[in-house]
A protein has these predicted regions:
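Short small-residue beta-strand/loop micro-motif enriched in glycine and branched aliphatics
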Residues: 31-35
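Charged, compositionally biased boundary regions
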Residues: 3, 7-12, 18, 37-176
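Short acidic-glycine loop/turn motifs at beta-strand connectors
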Residues: 26-30
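Short beta-strand scaffold segments in enzyme catalytic cores
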Residues: 21-25
Length: 176
């Protein structure tokens, strides 16, 4: 079942993906890496080529693809753009499974992307083995990608306050 695989994505990525194409690369029967693209980029020209290149570089045996989109999950058949993205991925690497997920959180639902009829509930991401491992390692799990971006954004007021202290410290003040 894909429920536990989808449920582990926030722990591996650091945030729950939305409007995303996620590729879970497998090597020797284990997850070797997880890659994510904004769905808009993945469905655009050459979008999945980035994923294929990275997956091939890691010499993965196969990949599980997850399209995370409430809109796509409502469609019984993937849109042409999403199908093209999945086809592009499968043209470059062996796709062992593809699912469409409405949301990666408790209560979310997944179904196979090829109409096979398989579907199920997303396992609670907060209680996954991967989430426990992430917390044990001291990694923070963010509520969204925007929270991750905000955590590394430059604080203009703080930079302005520290800049005078950096004069003569050996580095460009503008990079504070």
């Amino acid at each position: 079942t894909f429920g536990p695989i989808v449920g582990m994505l926030p722990a591996v990525l650091g945030f729950p993906p939305v409007q995303s194409l996620v590729a879970v690369a497998l090597k020797g029967g284990e997850v070797s890496c997880v890659l994510r693209l904004d769905l808009a980029d993945a469905t655009g020209p050459g979008g999945v080529e980035q994923l294929v290149h990275a997956i091939r570089g890691g010499k993965a045996d196969g990949v599980i693809a997850a399209v995370v989109s409430e809109e796509a999950a409502r469609d019984l058949v993937p849109s042409a753009a999403i199908q093209d993205a999945l086809d592009g991925l499968s043209a470059g690497v062996r796709v062992v499974g593809a699912v469409v997920v409405d949301r990666v959180q408790e209560g979310g639902r997944w179904r196979c992307a090829d109409g096979c009829g398989a579907s199920g509930a997303v396992s609670d991401p907060k209680s996954s083995v991967m989430a426990a491992a992430a917390v044990a390692e001291g990694r923070r799990l963010y509520g969204s990608r925007d929270e991750v971006v905000a955590s590394v954004a430059v604080d203009g007021a703080r930079a302005a306050a520290v800049a005078p202290l950096m004069v003569g410290a050996g580095g460009p003040v503008g990079d504070v």
